[in-house]
């Protein structure tokens, strides 16, 4: 079974580039300010989520193993 | 609302001090109809961010959709050249809206992501070392000519696999392309000359890359792979290659030059940078962001309304053209405390030097990396950087904030 992820988007950094939404649309939803929120962390594969995080142009996305606390990205 | 600001954006005052000119507009009429250019001028931070994040209302297809006369006016006999220029710019990926823009940006987006860019840091350091070693021999340099220009030009040319002896040619073409932001009535001449020469230069290079399997270490090859996936046509690959070459160095030139000038004018900030006494994020990171905020490389960008839309209480009609100003948004007192103060400790620094939304600058991480390494090297190497002139002359551009020269002594 896939491990549970805790995904956070730093809104001091997020510029609404929406590449995360393009790569993992089921997970990342833009809010009313058009900033990204990781609404559904279980809705896509870990690989896609990490790719979305890696392609954030301002490194606003952090991905952590929810059970162990291990940082998976950055 | 009536404003006391004259509509001509190319006066000596507006060029030398955009912060007063656009700042006054922001304070008096933040969404201003400029009658002279038939153009909405957006100058406040919040309006700018809202607009750039509502790309479905404000289109990036400027050259395709704008039906009004060129502004400022051009020679009547150059309308054919104007049309040629428009058609060329329409091929740039940044001149598209979703979904085409996303498909095209994705071809090269990964190349520029923060992890990928880190791999280039050692090379950036080595180019900086070479530039500064040379400057040390005389104790003087023109920051523009000897440091700010060669560094990013070398890096983008290297990324795209251009032979080193072509850098001079690339720069001279870029200088002509920069007429895009100027006001001379005969500006279409140098501009279209450069487009034609650039296309001629890049077409065989793109042809060569497109014929081979994609080389992930070569940006031009990666870009050309977009043709194989159907995201780009051959003409679009060539046009985007020109865009990457131009935008890949022109903006960073200004970051390094304007930032260095700011430090020479604020010795107490230079001292903080040298001593590095700031908490995470470190002084270099904060300083680079503050340089981007305080005297940003790009002054303004265009959009065109794709529907009737309200912005700042004004009704913007479908087809209206709009220019949003980073210079004034980055000094907006509603967003930044003491906005006219150069303060490298400022954090978080929510400037909009790279725009915002889906069109946020593709090369932002590269610009940051080069800026960080440049300021770091200057701070490590020199106690004093003294400007050897009292006159600062800027290129007469509405788009770029570019010093012509910046002669300094180094001790």
Which role does the model predict for each range below?
Chain B
Residues 1-411:
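Cytochrome P450
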């Amino acid at each position: 079974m896939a491990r549970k992820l805790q995904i956070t988007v730093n809104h001091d950094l997020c510029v609404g580039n929406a590449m995360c939404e393009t790569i993992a649309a089921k997970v990342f939803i833009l809010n009313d300010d058009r900033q990204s929120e990781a609404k559904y962390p279980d809705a896509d594969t870990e690989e896609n989520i990490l790719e979305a995080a890696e392609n954030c142009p301002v490194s606003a996305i952090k991905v952590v193993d929810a059970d162990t606390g291990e940082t998976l990205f950055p | 609302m009536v404003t006391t600001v004259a509509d001509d954006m190319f006066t000596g005052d507006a060029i030398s001090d955009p912060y007063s000119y656009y700042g006054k507009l922001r304070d008096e009429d933040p969404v201003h109809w400029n009658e002279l250019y038939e153009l909405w001028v957006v100058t406040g931070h919040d309006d700018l961010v809202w607009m750039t994040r509502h790309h479905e209302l404000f289109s990036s297809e400027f050259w395709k959709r704008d039906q009004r006369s060129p502004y400022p006016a051009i020679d009547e006999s150059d309308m054919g050249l104007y049309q040629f220029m428009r058609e060329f710019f329409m091929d740039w990926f940044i001149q598209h809206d979703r979904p085409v823009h996303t498909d095209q940006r994705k071809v090269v987006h990964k190349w520029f992501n923060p992890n990928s860019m880190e791999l280039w840091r050692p090379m950036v350091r080595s180019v900086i070392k070479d530039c500064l070693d040379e400057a040390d021999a005389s104790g003087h340099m023109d920051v523009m000519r000897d440091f700010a220009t060669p560094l990013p030009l070398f890096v983008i040319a290297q990324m795209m696999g251009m032979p080193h002896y072509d850098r001079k040619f690339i720069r001279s073409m870029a200088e002509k392309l920069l007429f895009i932001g100027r006001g001379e009535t005969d500006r279409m001449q140098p501009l279209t000359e450069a487009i034609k020469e650039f296309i001629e230069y890049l077409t065989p290079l793109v042809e060569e890359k497109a014929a081979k399997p994609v080389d992930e270490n070569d940006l031009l090859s990666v870009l050309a792979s977009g043709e194989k996936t159907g995201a780009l046509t051959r003409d679009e690959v060539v046009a985007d290659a020109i865009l990457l070459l131009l935008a890949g160095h022109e903006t960073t030139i200004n970051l390094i030059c304007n930032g260095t000038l700011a430090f020479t004018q604020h010795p107490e900030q230079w001292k903080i940078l040298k001593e590095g006494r700031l908490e995470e994020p470190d002084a270099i990171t904060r300083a680079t962001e503050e340089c981007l905020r305080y005297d940003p490389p790009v002054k303004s960008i265009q959009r065109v309304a794709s529907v009737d839309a309200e912005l700042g209480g004004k009704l913007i009609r479908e087809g209206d053209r709009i220019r949003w100003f980073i210079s004034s948004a980055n000094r907006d007192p509603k967003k930044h405390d003491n906005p006219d103060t150069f303060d490298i400790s400022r954090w978080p620094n929510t400037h909009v030097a790279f725009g915002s939304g889906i069109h946020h600058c593709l090369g932002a991480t590269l610009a940051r990396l080069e800026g960080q390494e440049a300021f770091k090297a200057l701070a490590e190497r020199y106690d004093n950087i003294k400007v050897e002139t009292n006159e600062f002359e800027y290129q007469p551009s509405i788009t770029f904030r570019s010093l012509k020269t910046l002669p300094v002594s180094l001790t």
